[in-house]
Every structure is written in C-alpha cells, then in structure tokens.
Amino acid sequence: MKQKTHKGTAKRIKVTGSGKLRRERAYRRHLLEGKPSTRTRRLKGTTDVSAADNKRMKRLLGKA
C-alpha cells in the first residue's frame, strides 16, 4: 500500500531545495495585545524544524 502524506503536517512544514524543513513560529496568531512587540518581532518569519523532530516529519511528509 502506498504511504500517504500527512496533510496537517504538509500544510505547516515546507521542504527547502536542499532538503531542510522550515516551519512558522508559534505564539503569533492571536492574543497579541498582551505580548511585548519585541517578542512578536522575534517570532516573525520561519525557523528550522529541530533535529530531534526531523526524521518523524520527513516520514509524515513522505520524504523519508
């Protein structure tokens, strides 16, 4: 049976050309009034998926 891509993971994680996994940072969706602007600025942009989670994420994406 073919391995299916986990769609929830596919919507959240992008694979770069070199094969690295990128994700958005958490804590920047709502309730931003109480958070300092320095914190929301720091949470801007994307970051790499941690090395501990890399193998699992690639398996969910069907890239393993």
Swiss-Prot record:
Segments of this protein annotated with the region Disordered: 1-20
Bilayer-crossing regions: none
GO terms under cellular component: cytosolic large ribosomal subunit
Gene Ontology terms, MF aspect: structural constituent of ribosome
Annotated keywords: Ribonucleoprotein, Ribosomal protein
One GO term of the biological process aspect: translation
Protein name, as recorded: Large ribosomal subunit protein bL35
Annotated source species: Corynebacterium urealyticum (strain ATCC 43042 / DSM 7109)
